[in-house]
Amino acid sequence: VAAEQDRLRRADIVVLQFPLFWFNIPSLLQRWMEEVWTHGFSHGTGGDALKGKKLLLSLTTGAPAQFFTPEGADAPDFTPLMQGLINAAGFTGMEFVGIESTGGVSYSLRTEAEQLAAIEAKADEHAQRLIDRISAL
């Protein structure tokens, strides 16, 4: 826990990268937050270690992006699903700077070489968009 907290202290930008799992963050990420973002570290008396840091969410989904795109919109909107993390950012004094997402990268699609190549290309594109967003912060 101390090593994770030290990494967070040294960071200006915190990127939480995860697959969307049943419309939420994975349980291991939730557990990590519960164990690392502790009273006295991230919040509460003396708990200002995350204050002023930028929080960027980077997520992937197995379902295609259009599944998460509201009618009439051009892009998916994960804000309602990520409201808990957005609230956690505010509670800890972090600045929430957005969500980078890529859909259609399910493990179940990795059965043929063409499908795997398409998923790898999506992953590369996601990584580049993430780099661009971080560079702009």
Identify what each model region corresponds to.
Residues A75, M82-L137:
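Glycine-rich phosphate/pyrophosphate-binding loop and the adjoining helix
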Residues A2-I86:
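Helix-loop-strand module that forms the ligand-binding subsite of alpha/beta enzymes
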